[in-house]
Amino acid sequence: MTKGGIRIKAYKLLRKKKDGLLYPLFIHKQYSTPIGEWMQAECYPTKGFSVRTGWHCCFQPLAPHLKMKLSSGEERVWVECEVEDWESYDRPESQGGSWILAQRMKIIRELSDDEVIQLKAEYYGFA
């Protein structure tokens, strides 16, 4: 695990509901996450999930183990965010590699599908 005290750019996968608001995928998922506001991480133990307090983010918009479109019609979108008071958490490449667990996060903007494709191409050296 690596700790980071500086503010960095990160990416987070969220649910976008019909109301246009953004929501976490699994933990505390009934509460929307506003754009442009700093949010403090809180601990919400949830059955079936390991307790890892912090906003779960990525260094790149990569989460190959998660689907973007579900049969339920749920839409998932990537957002660019800033995080503070974070640490990296090593995960297998099949889960996107290292995750970021941040104590503070601010969503900057939603990324378009084209932006996500471009960022992945740059990450894999195809751009």
Locate each region found by the language model.
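ADP-ribose/NAD+-binding catalytic cleft of ART/PARP-like enzymes
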Residues: 1-52, 68-75, 87-90
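Intrinsic low-complexity, intrinsically disordered segments enriched in polar/basic residues
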Residues: 16-18, 56-57, 123
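ADP-ribosyltransferase catalytic core
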Residues: 41-115
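Peripheral, non-AAA+ core regions of ATP-driven protein-machinery
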Residues: 111-127
